[in-house]
């Protein structure tokens, strides 16, 4: 279990961290998007946490895509700093999506706030912000492309990995493949297509190759 929370307890425990120089310590690879908790704060150091995908663009650089109208983008634009927090705790992702985390869920590190008990975190300072309009099947939305440089990389003994949805898309596709003979071909194709979209968006070369093989095998099986 992640170091973020003790089972069935309210306040998470503090953990000790080891300092590292770059994102390689978290096994974050360039071109992959990782599911994290981004912590920001206002002028009064009131913390805000939000589940946000962070794109690794180098050993010490990341890119975030933030939607207009959120406290995260407001805080980032205001002070130009944030922390990226790694946790495997499903309740942290859930609670920070459905509402606000309590004040005691945050800890201070220098002039930054981070998620108390996170398996790892790193400080980040904004390098540039570009505003654009995103158009997709859901319509149009304003988006801020935030490029940032990682500073201090802190890792606890509880660290296992930074979440990347690509591998889960592959696993879900393999489960669907094994049930192909009992499934509606149209529904199955739609399911695999959605998983392929996820893998291509957030995964690396191996996830993309895995999906290619699954799709090829599936077509041979049901055609």
Swiss-Prot record:
Gene3D superfamilies on file: Electron Transport, Fmn-binding Protein, Chain A, Hypothetical membrane protein ta0354_69_121
InterPro entries noted in UniProt: DUF447_C, DUF447_N, Split_barrel_FMN-bd, UCP018747
Top-level taxon of origin: Archaea
SUPFAM superfamilies in UniProt: FMN-binding split barrel
Transmembrane portions of the chain: none
Protein family per UniProt: To M.jannaschii MJ1453.
Protein's name in the database: Uncharacterized protein MTH_863
């Amino acid at each position: 279990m992640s170091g973020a929370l003790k089972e069935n307890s309210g306040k998470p425990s503090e953990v000790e961290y080891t300092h590292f120089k770059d994102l390689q310590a978290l096994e974050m690879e360039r071109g992959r998007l990782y599911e994290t908790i981004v912590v920001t704060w206002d002028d009064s150091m009131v913390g805000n946490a939000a589940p946000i995908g962070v794109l690794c663009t180098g050993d010490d650089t990341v890119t975030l895509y933030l939607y207009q109208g959120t406290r995260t983008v407001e805080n980032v634009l205001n002070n130009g700093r944030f922390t990226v927090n790694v946790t495997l705790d499903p309740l942290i992702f859930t609670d920070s999506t459905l509402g606000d985390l309590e004040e005691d869920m945050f800890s201070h590190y220098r002039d930054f706030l981070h998620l108390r008990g996170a398996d790892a975190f790193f400080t980040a300072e904004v390098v540039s912000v570009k505003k654009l309009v995103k158009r997709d099947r859901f319509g149009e939305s304003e988006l801020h492309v935030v490029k940032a440089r990682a500073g201090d990389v802190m890792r606890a003994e509880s660290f296992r990995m930074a979440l990347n949805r690509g591998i889960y898309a592959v696993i879900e596709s393999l489960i669907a493949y094994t049930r192909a003979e009992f499934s509606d071909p149209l529904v199955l194709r739609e399911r695999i297509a959605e998983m392929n979209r996820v893998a291509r968006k957030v995964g690396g070369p191996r996830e993309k190759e895995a999906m290619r093989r699954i799709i090829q095998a599936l077509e041979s099986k049901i055609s």
